[in-house]
């Protein structure tokens, strides 16, 4: 039985090893998190979760400097629902609240920027793929890959 996602909701695309961060003043006080970015037919969901990948799997998801539209193997809707329940900092963005999806260049790196409207307030989130990460004192990205997000942007806009 699903608690956080609806019974008729299904995964359209998923991308592991994504770093998410809120843009603006509130983002300054929060650390960016590594997780899985999931597009369902009703929501965009970011679940903070470490997923180990071998180099061959990295090519499947973001090879050729492009964020590819694919689904993670062995990651179902029930797994997603369980991860959302376990991680209180999961981010659920209903597709009807999304105002804009775009590719933004910052520090010579492309990020996926999603703007949402909640209760009349606009919140902005950036998502990127880390090239190198530091593990001490906490796991944080040092550099990001310059990834083309156009395939994801087109897919998200087709569901809006």
Where would I find each of the regions flagged by the language model?
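The phosphoinositide-binding surface of pleckstrin homology
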Residues: 2-31
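Acidic, Ser/Thr- and proline-rich intrinsically disordered linker/docking segments
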Residues: 32-34, 45-160
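Structural motif
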Residues: 40-41
